[in-house]
Design a protein with these regions (language model features):
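Catalytic core of PPM/PP2C metal-dependent serine/threonine phosphatase domains
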Residues: 200-266, 284, 333, 345-346
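N-terminal entry segment of metal-dependent catalytic domains or homologous docking segments
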Residues: 145-195, 200, 206-207, 280-282, ...
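C-terminal catalytic subdomain
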Residues: 2-4, 16-21, 223-229, 233, ...
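Short acidic, Gly/Ser-rich segments with clustered Asp/Glu that frequently serve as metal-coordination loops
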Residues: 90, 194-201, 303-308
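Bergerat-fold GHKL ATPase/HATPase_c domain
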Residues: 1-51, 155-181, 310-311
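Conserved beta-strand-loop-beta-strand hairpin that lines the nucleotide-binding pocket
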Residues: 1-12, 57-154, 182-190, 219, ...
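PP2C/PPM family metal-dependent serine/threonine protein phosphatase catalytic domain
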Residues: 156-175, 222-230, 257-288, 292, ...
């Protein structure tokens, strides 16, 4: 039976810390060594991760005046992601900055090039400040990915996806949950937000993976989830299906969540009929669309602010979906709620 990825088990924030000074590296190195040893990571890969971590911290301190953070994530496919996100001025010449010897602060200039060489995958997004009045985010996001298995299945599937899920104040219980399954040329997912937050919200969204195994349609999944959530706190949800064989997308949802479809440099924002699964809701809102060679679909809980579009993040939606999820989650997340983003892409 094909595995169903579960954000509660497969998408975990293992470390999160501000990088105000070079001393931030001490705690990060200690955490990295403990985690990689526990996971049985080879000595060579562990050393590569430590070197990348050092470069990321150094970049944040030198180029963003310490206005940044470093995160370590465990993600589906048995991978570890080192993420650097800062609120600096951005990189004026990204291509040049990745060439050894290039430096804007009179250093040896080996940072970005070394990060790309030492990691299994590396993705970089940057946005510059254009004026003093500019209100949108500026800075740089770097994702360095390390595969703990020899081979990545993502490259062969035709799909790429990224998950971001954090509980309120990074506490133990998270009412937001994402289930995702790949079946041949199909990608299906169920994205839920349990009412409120805490232990009861998490209980409402737990143990729902089987609904992706016994699949009929997005609407049918929501109906069965609705029945299962009776006598719980309840949840709002989105479910979707991407069919590569038919170049078809289907999305259905109930309640205060949003979907965003990016195609040919345009983004469509979708909201759903009000209601709560397990309690009371109106007819489910469904969307069906055909897509071309490049397509991105984003679903988000209400823990992610909605006042953004392509102009806020120019060029972001052509990046790897995991980098998109990290960027939106960290920058647009509300600190007063659980937060989750699911990003799926084709092409």
């Amino acid at each position: 039976m094909t595995k169903v990825f579960d954000s509660a088990k497969d998408c975990k924030l293992l470390f999160n810390n501000a990088t105000q000074t070079e001393s931030s590296l001490i705690l990060l190195r200690s955490k990295l060594v403990a985690i990689t040893q526990r996971l049985g990571v080879s000595a060579l890969k562990q050393e590569n991760m430590l070197l990348v971590a050092s470069e990321l911290v150094s970049n944040n301190v030198k180029h963003a005046a310490g206005r940044g953070m470093i995160q370590l994530w465990k993600q589906p496919g048995n991978v570890l992601d080192l993420l650097s996100l800062d609120y600096g001025p951005g990189i004026a010449n990204l291509a040049g900055a990745e060439v050894d010897g290039f430096s804007s602060v009179s250093t040896l200039g080996k940072g970005l090039g070394a990060i790309r060489r030492l990691s299994d995958e590396c993705y970089i997004y940057t946005q510059q400040q254009r004026s003093e009045q500019q209100k949108k985010w500026t800075g740089t996001v770097i994702m360095a990915r390390f595969h703990l298995d020899k081979e990545s299945k993502e490259a062969k599937s035709g799909f790429k996806f990224g998950l971001y899920s954090r509980s309120l104040s990074d506490e133990r219980y998270n009412g937001d949950r994402i289930y995702l399954k790949r079946v041949g040329k199909m990608l299906r997912w169920l994205h839920l937000d349990g009412l409120g937050h805490g232990e009861e919200a998490q209980a409402a969204t737990a143990d729902l993976a089987m609904h992706l195994q016994n699949y009929e349609s997005p609407e049918a999944i929501l109906e069965t989830v609705d029945h299962q959530l009776v006598n719980t706190r309840g949840a709002v949800a989105i479910t979707g299906e991407i069919d590569l064989a038919k170049y078809n997308l289907r999305v259905s949802g109930v309640g205060d969540m949003t979907a965003h479809i990016y195609d040919q440099e345009q983004i469509q924002h979708i909201t759903f009929a009000p209601g709560i699964l397990g309690r009371e809701h109106r007819t489910m809102t469904g969307v069906q669309a055909e897509f071309g060679k490049k397509h991105v679909i984003i679903t988000a809980s209400d823990g992610i602010r909605r006042n953004w579009d392509t102009s806020n993040f120019s060029g972001l939606f052509n990046q790897h979906p995991q980098l998109i999820a990290y960027t939106l989650g960290n920058i647009m997340g509300r600190i007063s709620d659980d937060q989750s983003v699911c990003v799926c892409s084709i092409g």
